[in-house]
Design a protein with these regions (language model features):
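Flexible glycine/proline-enriched surface loops and loop-helix/loop-strand junctions
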Residues: 16, 114, 155-156, 209-213, ...
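Conserved short loop/turn motifs at secondary-structure junctions
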Residues: 49-57, 216-220, 244-251
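Short helix-capping/linker segments at secondary-structure and domain boundaries
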Residues: 75-76, 178-186, 251-252, 267-274
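A glycine-rich, hydrophobic/aromatic-adjacent loop/helix-cap motif
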Residues: 234-321
């Protein structure tokens, strides 16, 4: 039952329509806060969850997860970026230790080779695409676009139409060419990498990693020649690798991102001007929402929280089951 002071104020509210009332901001927040605490007391702290977003600022994302974890004492906090680009975070943190782009977009003007995979860049990231198109038109960089369909960006460079669900296959084929032709950067590998020999043996002994395999895939036989060409350009020039949701929203998304980072490390295309790894995020603060801890399994700065919460699909199941009573 409502507290006496809130109940008294409800009676004075002006009707907006048959379902809603007009109410001052201070009163509505007080009412919402009371209801959340009422749910917590009746059903426990796990009956509440928070769903953040990747279009908010870093500051608001930090305060949001702090409210869920510290004020409501619930571990259930998530945001939409975990669904779309968590494979980039996982793949990059596993291989290079940090799940973020490694260089600024203006490095596009300083690179010699651009590879774009799984991204309709002109539509989704037009400011980035403008830089790519300028570099391709000015012939300061070669451009290779790898996708399951033809995109507008491919008009300005080489287009590789690949089979559906073949991202990891194609990336391993690029690695096979670089390894078999010894185009890798031995100095960088010796000073910066571990596990190279095991990785090399794994790729070279995988029959599906040889681009010759594409001769057996009807309609894609031409990739037997195109994939090695892209791989050689990537290995022998200052190169940047861009990818989008066409990589990450697949079952093998994390592994595909790891394959991309492996390519950059063994060729030394990271940590220098005009080289690097560039995940193209779906919203304006995907990186910040994750960095500040709006994830069920990470706190701010990717610290491990005291309790791991549920992810969005699990939370929806819990709502249907009647176990989650409130979501903010």
């Amino acid at each position: 039952e409502l507290p006496r002071e809130l109940k008294a104020r409800v009676k004075t509210l002006k009707s907006f329509d048959e379902n809603y009332y007009e109410a001052p901001y201070e009163f509505t927040t007080s009412l919402a806060a009371w209801k959340l605490m009422d749910i917590k007391e009746k059903y426990g702290r796990h009956a509440f969850c928070g769903m953040g977003g990747a279009r908010t600022s870093c500051e608001s994302s930090y305060v949001f997860q702090k409210f869920v974890r510290n004020a409501m004492n619930s571990p259930h906090v998530d945001n939409c970026a975990r669904v779309c680009h968590s494979p980039s975070l996982k793949g990059m943190r596993t291989t290079i230790g940090e799940g973020a782009a490694t260089n600024p977009f203006d490095d596009i003007y300083k690179t010699e080779n651009i590879v774009v995979m799984g991204s309709n860049t002109t539509e989704a990231h037009p400011i980035v695409a403008n830089r790519m198109i300028k570099a391709a038109r000015d012939k300061t960089a070669t451009l290779s676009v790898i996708d399951v369909r033809q995109t507008q960006l491919s008009k300005f460079g080489e287009q590789l139409i690949i089979p559906y669900e073949a991202n990891l296959l194609v990336l391993n084929m690029m690695a096979y060419v670089i390894l078999s032709e010894k185009l890798y950067n031995t100095e960088f590998i010796d000073s910066r990498c571990t596990g190279f020999e095991a990785y090399k043996d794994s790729i070279l002994n995988d029959p599906y990693a040889n681009p010759e395999y594409m001769k057996n895939v009807s309609g894609y036989e031409y990739l037997t020649e195109q994939i090695p060409t892209v791989a050689r350009l990537y290995a022998t020039k200052k190169s940047m690798f861009f990818w989008g949701l066409g990589i990450t929203e697949h079952l093998d998304g994390s592994y595909a991102v790891m394959a991309i980072t492996h390519l950059s490390m063994m060729t030394g295309n990271i940590g220098k001007t005009g080289t690097g790894l560039m995940p193209l995020r779906g919203q304006n603060n995907v990186q910040g929402a994750c960095d500040t801890g709006c994830l069920p399994y990470y706190g701010p700065d990717y610290s491990v929280p005291e309790e791991i919460g549920l992810m969005t699909p699990q939370l929806i199941d819990e709502m249907i089951a009647g176990k989650i009573k409130a979501m903010y």
